[in-house]
Structures are given as structure tokens and as C-alpha cells.
């Protein structure tokens, strides 16, 4: 599904994306030897779990049979599902975990951009705004969580 045709398909891709990120952070938190990295990764699991629930809640409100179709756009890149320069494959340090969490993910941005530009329908624009706001809030929460006052 590299070229989603409906709003529901975008939500399915977002559900898969957040589920994969949650699983990655959970695995890394379990393997972490750096205590601060483990705490951060556990917090990231909570944030991704929240994102996953928000997306699933939006999906429950839509009937996939009565889909809102997207305007045509470029095919989404499947190869970019995580930051290319991320160091979270093994046992990341706190700084590597933080960089991973804050690194902009190209696929997520593509999905949200496609949703934002797909329709003039207020309900779709509202959905796109809610999902974009959620990602911005997550970024602020990560930044606040890691502040050293």
C-alpha cells in the first residue's frame, strides 16, 4: 500500500507506523544498559502507545466502505520508515535514543502531508490537524522530559 487512495488507508499506515515504533522502543528499552536511555525509551513507548490509540480511535469513527478518497499524489517512499542516521539498532545511549526520537521521520511527514492536502472537507482537515498537533505535542513532551533543570 505505497500509494494510499483513501483517508482510511492513510490511517491504516499510521497505525502500522506507530505500532512498529512502539515495538522498537519497547525492545530497545528491554535491552538498554544505559539507565537514562531506558527511562527515555519507556517514555517513548507510552507516547507511541498514545498515538496508536488516537489513530485507532479515528479509524473506529470511519466506515472503510464509505471512504473519503484522496487526491492523487506522489507514491510514498517505502524505504524511509525510520531516520537514516539513527543509531537505535543496538544498545543506544541516552543521546542516541533522544536523537532517534526527535529525528523527523520522512514517511510520517509524507502521510500527514497527504492527508492535509487531500480534501476540502472540514472533517478531513480537522483529522489532519489533530494528527499533526499530536506529533507536535509528542515532540514537546520529549523535549520537556529530557530537560535538565
Task: Locate predicted features.
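Short loop-to-helix capping motifs
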Residues: 33-35, 121-122
Amino acid at each position: 500500500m505505497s500509494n494510499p487512495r483513501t483517508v482510511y488507508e492513510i490511517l491504516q499506515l499510521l497505525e502500522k507506523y506507530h505500532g512498529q515504533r512502539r515495538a522498537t522502543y519497547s525492545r530497545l528499552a528491554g535491552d538498554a544498559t544505559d539507565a537514562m536511555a531506558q527511562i527515555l525509551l519507556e517514555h517513548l513507548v507510552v507516547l507511541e502507545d498514545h498515538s496508536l490509540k488516537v489513530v485507532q480511535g479515528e479509524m473506529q469513527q470511519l466506515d472503510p466502505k464509505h471512504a473519503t478518497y484522496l487526491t492523487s499524489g506522489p507514491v510514498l517512499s517505502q524505504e524511509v520508515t525510520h531516520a537514516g542516521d539513527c543509531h537505535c539498532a543496538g544498545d543506544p545511549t541516552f543521546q542516541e535514543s533522544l536523537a532517534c526520537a526527535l529525528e523527523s521521520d520522512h514517511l510520517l511527514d509524507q502521510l500527514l502531508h497527504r492527508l492535509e492536502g487531500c480534501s476540502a472537507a472540514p472533517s478531513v482537515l480537522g483529522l489532519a490537524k489533530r494528527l499533526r498537533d499530536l506529533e507536535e505535542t509528542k515532540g514537546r513532551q520529549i523535549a520537556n522530559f529530557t530537560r535538565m533543570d
